[in-house]
């Protein structure tokens, strides 16, 4: 499911809750909310903060050391520089949902 499909899913899911007394929201509202959450997670991790959403999972940064590697085309040795890797660790509720528990 890509972002556009997910926004449509959020909107349809919102209409499902309308019957339970909740207000529905538009695709524009869903896109704005999703963008705000994603931008907030990116900003927090960029500033070296981890984001923990209980049950869902945690977003963070892992530092990777520089290391030796090889150019796949030429086979020549090369140094792969150190870098920071974004990471996500799934929480218990997400794991349970994926395993139909």
From Swiss-Prot:
Keywords: DNA condensation, DNA-binding. The gene is hup. One of its GO terms (biological process) is chromosome condensation. This is DNA-binding protein HU. Belongs to the bacterial histone-like protein family. Signal peptide: none annotated. GO terms for molecular function: DNA binding; structural constituent of chromatin. Histone-like DNA-binding protein which is capable of wrapping DNA to stabilize it, and thus to prevent its denaturation under extreme environmental conditions. InterPro entries: Hist_DNA-bd, Histone-like_DNA-bd_CS, IHF-like_DNA-bd_dom_sf.
